[in-house]
Protein backbone atom coordinates (compact mmCIF):
# COMPACT_ATOMS: atom_id res chain seq x y z
CA UNK A 1 0.00 0.00 0.00
CA UNK A 2 1.28 3.45 -0.91
CA UNK A 3 -0.10 6.82 0.18
CA UNK A 4 1.28 10.03 -1.29
CA UNK A 5 0.57 13.45 0.16
CA UNK A 6 -0.88 15.94 -2.28
CA UNK A 7 -2.14 19.39 -1.41
CA UNK A 8 -5.06 21.70 -2.00
CA UNK A 9 -2.47 23.95 -3.63
CA UNK A 10 -1.85 21.21 -6.20
CA UNK A 11 -5.53 20.46 -6.70
CA UNK A 12 -6.94 23.99 -6.62
CA UNK A 13 -4.06 26.49 -6.63
CA UNK A 14 -2.75 29.02 -4.12
CA UNK A 15 -1.14 32.40 -4.67
CA UNK A 16 2.65 32.37 -4.72
CA UNK A 17 3.03 28.58 -4.69
CA UNK A 18 3.23 27.58 -8.36
CA UNK A 19 6.25 25.30 -7.89
CA UNK A 20 4.76 23.61 -4.81
CA UNK A 21 1.39 23.17 -6.52
CA UNK A 22 2.98 21.67 -9.62
CA UNK A 23 4.92 19.15 -7.54
CA UNK A 24 1.88 18.17 -5.47
CA UNK A 25 -0.36 17.69 -8.52
CA UNK A 26 2.48 15.73 -10.12
CA UNK A 27 2.08 13.20 -7.31
CA UNK A 28 -1.54 12.70 -8.38
CA UNK A 29 -0.37 11.96 -11.92
CA UNK A 30 2.18 9.50 -10.55
CA UNK A 31 -0.55 7.86 -8.43
CA UNK A 32 -2.83 7.52 -11.45
CA UNK A 33 -0.09 5.76 -13.40
CA UNK A 34 1.08 3.52 -10.55
CA UNK A 35 -2.49 2.37 -9.80
CA UNK A 36 -2.53 0.88 -13.31
CA UNK A 37 1.00 -0.52 -13.19
CA UNK A 38 0.60 -1.97 -9.69
CA UNK A 39 -2.84 -3.55 -10.17
CA UNK A 40 -1.51 -6.92 -11.35
CA UNK A 41 0.47 -7.25 -8.10
CA UNK A 42 -2.30 -5.94 -5.81
CA UNK A 43 -0.29 -2.78 -5.17
CA UNK A 44 -2.68 0.00 -4.26
CA UNK A 45 -1.79 3.67 -4.22
CA UNK A 46 -3.85 6.58 -2.97
CA UNK A 47 -3.36 10.22 -2.10
CA UNK A 48 -4.28 12.22 0.96
CA UNK A 49 -4.91 15.95 0.70
CA UNK A 50 -4.57 17.02 4.34
CA UNK A 51 -5.53 20.24 6.03
CA UNK A 52 -3.48 20.13 9.20
CA UNK A 53 -1.45 22.33 11.49
CA UNK A 54 2.19 21.99 10.44
CA UNK A 55 5.31 24.15 10.35
CA UNK A 56 4.01 25.52 7.04
CA UNK A 57 0.75 26.71 8.61
CA UNK A 58 2.18 28.09 11.87
CA UNK A 59 1.58 31.81 12.01
CA UNK A 60 -0.92 31.72 9.14
CA UNK A 61 -3.92 30.94 11.31
CA UNK A 62 -4.93 31.73 14.89
CA UNK A 63 -4.06 29.16 17.56
CA UNK A 64 -7.74 28.26 18.11
CA UNK A 65 -8.03 27.33 14.42
CA UNK A 66 -4.77 25.38 14.42
CA UNK A 67 -6.03 23.44 17.46
CA UNK A 68 -8.84 22.08 15.26
CA UNK A 69 -6.35 20.96 12.61
CA UNK A 70 -4.30 18.39 14.48
CA UNK A 71 -2.51 15.98 12.13
CA UNK A 72 -3.99 13.06 14.07
CA UNK A 73 -7.43 14.19 12.85
CA UNK A 74 -6.29 13.10 9.36
CA UNK A 75 -4.83 9.72 10.40
CA UNK A 76 -8.06 7.63 10.50
CA UNK A 77 -8.69 8.50 6.86
CA UNK A 78 -5.16 7.50 5.88
CA UNK A 79 -5.65 4.19 7.69
CA UNK A 80 -8.59 3.48 5.38
CA UNK A 81 -6.35 4.09 2.37
CA UNK A 82 -3.94 1.32 3.43
CA UNK A 83 -6.26 -1.40 4.72
CA UNK A 84 -6.45 -4.79 3.02
CA UNK A 85 -9.49 -3.89 0.89
CA UNK A 86 -8.37 -0.30 0.29
CA UNK A 87 -9.40 1.51 -2.85
CA UNK A 88 -6.76 2.52 -5.35
CA UNK A 89 -6.36 5.84 -7.12
CA UNK A 90 -8.39 7.78 -4.57
CA UNK A 91 -7.71 11.33 -3.45
CA UNK A 92 -8.94 11.70 0.13
CA UNK A 93 -9.33 15.23 1.43
CA UNK A 94 -9.00 15.27 5.20
CA UNK A 95 -8.84 17.78 8.01
CA UNK A 96 -10.35 18.60 11.40
CA UNK A 97 -12.12 15.23 11.42
CA UNK A 98 -13.90 15.93 8.10
CA UNK A 99 -13.31 13.81 5.00
CA UNK A 100 -14.29 13.96 1.33
CA UNK A 101 -13.15 12.50 -1.97
CA UNK A 102 -11.63 14.73 -4.66
CA UNK A 103 -11.66 13.68 -8.30
CA UNK A 104 -10.45 14.91 -11.64
CA UNK A 105 -13.44 14.70 -13.96
CA UNK A 106 -14.28 15.73 -17.49
CA UNK A 107 -17.50 17.10 -18.92
CA UNK A 108 -19.32 15.30 -21.73
CA UNK A 109 -17.89 17.81 -24.19
CA UNK A 110 -18.85 18.42 -27.79
CA UNK A 111 -17.65 17.62 -31.28
CA UNK A 112 -17.05 20.95 -33.02
CA UNK A 113 -15.69 19.91 -36.40
CA UNK A 114 -12.52 19.45 -38.41
CA UNK A 115 -10.79 21.23 -41.25
CA UNK A 116 -12.25 24.61 -42.22
CA UNK A 117 -15.22 24.10 -39.84
CA UNK A 118 -12.89 24.01 -36.83
CA UNK A 119 -12.47 27.63 -35.80
CA UNK A 120 -12.17 29.52 -32.55
CA UNK A 121 -15.67 30.85 -33.26
CA UNK A 122 -17.04 27.30 -33.63
CA UNK A 123 -15.51 26.34 -30.28
CA UNK A 124 -17.00 29.50 -28.76
CA UNK A 125 -20.43 28.61 -30.19
CA UNK A 126 -20.22 25.18 -28.50
CA UNK A 127 -18.78 26.56 -25.25
CA UNK A 128 -21.91 26.03 -23.16
CA UNK A 129 -22.00 22.37 -24.21
CA UNK A 130 -18.25 21.95 -23.70
CA UNK A 131 -18.39 23.37 -20.17
CA UNK A 132 -21.72 21.84 -19.06
CA UNK A 133 -20.96 20.13 -15.75
CA UNK A 134 -24.30 18.31 -15.46
CA UNK A 135 -22.66 15.17 -16.87
CA UNK A 136 -19.14 14.36 -15.71
CA UNK A 137 -16.93 11.34 -16.25
CA UNK A 138 -14.04 10.07 -14.16
CA UNK A 139 -11.51 8.26 -16.35
CA UNK A 140 -9.46 5.43 -14.86
CA UNK A 141 -6.71 5.65 -17.48
CA UNK A 142 -5.51 7.91 -20.27
CA UNK A 143 -6.81 5.47 -22.87
CA UNK A 144 -10.36 6.06 -21.65
CA UNK A 145 -9.89 9.77 -22.32
CA UNK A 146 -8.84 8.96 -25.88
CA UNK A 147 -11.85 6.67 -26.32
CA UNK A 148 -14.09 9.53 -25.21
CA UNK A 149 -12.57 11.85 -27.82
CA UNK A 150 -13.23 9.28 -30.56
CA UNK A 151 -16.79 8.72 -29.28
CA UNK A 152 -17.41 12.47 -29.59
CA UNK A 153 -15.91 12.37 -33.08
CA UNK A 154 -18.15 9.48 -34.15
CA UNK A 155 -21.26 11.08 -32.68
CA UNK A 156 -20.43 14.40 -34.31
CA UNK A 157 -19.88 12.88 -37.73
CA UNK A 158 -23.24 11.07 -37.49
CA UNK A 159 -25.17 14.16 -36.52
Predicted stretch roles:
Residues 7:
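Residue(s) in the substrate-gating loop at a strand-loop-helix junction
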Residues 28, 35-48, 86-94:
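Conserved Rossmann-fold SDR core element
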Residues 65-157:
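C-terminal helical subdomain
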Residues 18, 26-29, 73:
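Conserved cofactor-binding/catalytic machinery of classical short-chain dehydrogenase/reductase
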Residues 12-19:
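Active-site loop immediately N-terminal to the catalytic Tyr-X3-Lys motif
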Residues 10-12, 54:
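Conserved catalytic-site region of short-chain dehydrogenase/reductase
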Residues 41, 49-59:
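Short, flexible catalytic-loop segment of classical short-chain dehydrogenase/reductase
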Amino acid sequence: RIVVTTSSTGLYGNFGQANYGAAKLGLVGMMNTLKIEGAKNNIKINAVCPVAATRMTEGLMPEEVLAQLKPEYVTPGVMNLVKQDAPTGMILSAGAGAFSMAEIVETRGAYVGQGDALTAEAVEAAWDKITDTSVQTHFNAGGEHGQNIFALLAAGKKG
